A protein has these predicted regions:
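Signature (C-motif/LSGGQ) region and adjacent switch/coupling loops
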Residues: 65, 120, 140, 166, ...
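The feature captures the beta-strand-to-loop junction immediately N-terminal to the Walker
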Residues: 85-87
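Helix-to-loop junction immediately C-terminal to a conserved catalytic motif
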Residues: 100
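Conserved ABC transporter NBD signature motif
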Residues: 108-120
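Hydrophobic anchor residue at the start of the ABC signature
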Residues: 127, 191
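Short coil-to-helix segment of the ABC ATPase nucleotide-binding domain corresponding to the Q-loop/switch region
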Residues: 137-144
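Conserved ABC ATPase "signature" region
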Residues: 144, 153-173, 225
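Conserved signature/switch motifs of ABC ATPase nucleotide-binding domains
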Residues: 176-179, 197
């Protein structure tokens, strides 16, 4: 079971809201501030970039069928930032692997840009919790490794690697090896490696989970900047509710046994977001109430 060690302080002037009031406030806020949750470069929200229809996934455990996902239905618009939260074992990472095409054994359908996902594709990039850098390769070599299955010209590869190193703020560390840089910098290399192929969909599986709190906050801000800069459709799997509220346009709350969507919470907050604002804290408290960590009276 996942525990969220976060103190919730709504301030003296903020009265507690019921779930119904919270939902009403979210809807009203979204209506009066339409477009605030998207960046200036992400305005094409008409057609779905990703359509997940009645997806189910089971594993065979000895002679028993283990139902991991059941009845997953989700529509994600181009340029949207979606966060998925839920307790360990609810199938968050499994769902991300299906979207990435790393696992094609499931029921239902997953369509990306109007076509069924039948395997991995360079238009979909993924970043895992572990940076998975090769210790014998430098920063630039680790990023350039993404081109190994492409026929992109050598000069174009070099230009793209240089650009991504600059975008993630690693100038001066091109020749450094993984053991010579911090964990946060290593994760930036992993993100740059995912972005260097210019994907349209970025999948993030707990990318900051192993980092210290301060580095995590810094990289959350960095990820927000990259999302706005690149205009990517982004799906983030996380256990950190505050991280989800800080980054996402919508939060998918999942429950377990089998993994399914409990509800979807909109986050109608302008960017950059103020973590101390009353509405930010109310949304966070409401989502955390799903995990019995905070009571919303």
């Amino acid at each position: 079971m996942t525990t969220y060690n976060v103190a919730i302080s709504l301030g003296k002037n903020v009265s507690p809201l019921t779930r119904a009031q919270l939902a009403t406030n979210y809807t009203a806020k979204a209506s009066s501030n339409e477009g605030l949750a998207s960046s200036q470069g992400n305005k094409e929200f008409d057609n779905p970039s990703l359509l997940i229809s009645n997806v189910g996934k089971s594993y065979q455990l000895h002679e028993t069928s283990l139902n991991v996902l059941n009845g997953i239905n989700l529509e994600i618009k181009p340029g949207e930032f979606l966060s998925i939260v839920g307790a360990s074992g609810c199938g968050k990472s499994t769902l991300l692997r299906l979207i990435a095409g790393l696992d094609t054994s499931y029921s239902g359908s997953i369509d990306y840009q109007g076509k069924p996902i039948t395997g991995t594709d360079l238009s979909r990039g993924i970043v895992f919790q572990e940076h998975r850098l090769f210790p014998w390769l430098t920063v630039e070599e680790n990023i350039a490794l993404a081109f190994s299955a492409t026929n992109i010209a050598k000069e174009e590869r070099k230009l793209r690697v240089e650009k991504q190193i600059s975008i993630v703020g690693l100038n001066g560390f091109e020749k450094a090896y993984p053991h010579q840089i911090s964990g946060g910098m290593s994760q930036r290399v992993a993100i740059a490696r995912a972005l260097v192929l210019k994907p349209k969909l970025l999948l993030l599986d707990e990318p900051f989970g192993a980092l210290d709190a301060l580095t995590r906050l810094k990289l959350q801000q960095e990820l927000q900047r990259l999302w706005e800069h690149e205009g990517l459709t982004t799906i983030l799997v996380t256990h950190d509710v505050e991280e989800a509220v800080f980054l996402a346009d919508r939060i998918v709350v999942m429950e377990s046994h089998p993994g399914r969507i409990k509800r979807i919470v909109p986050v109608p907050l302008a960017r950059p977001r103020d973590r101390s604002s009353a509405l930010f804290q109310r949304i966070k408290a409401d989502v955390m109430a799903d995990f019995a960590m905070v009571e919303v009276e």
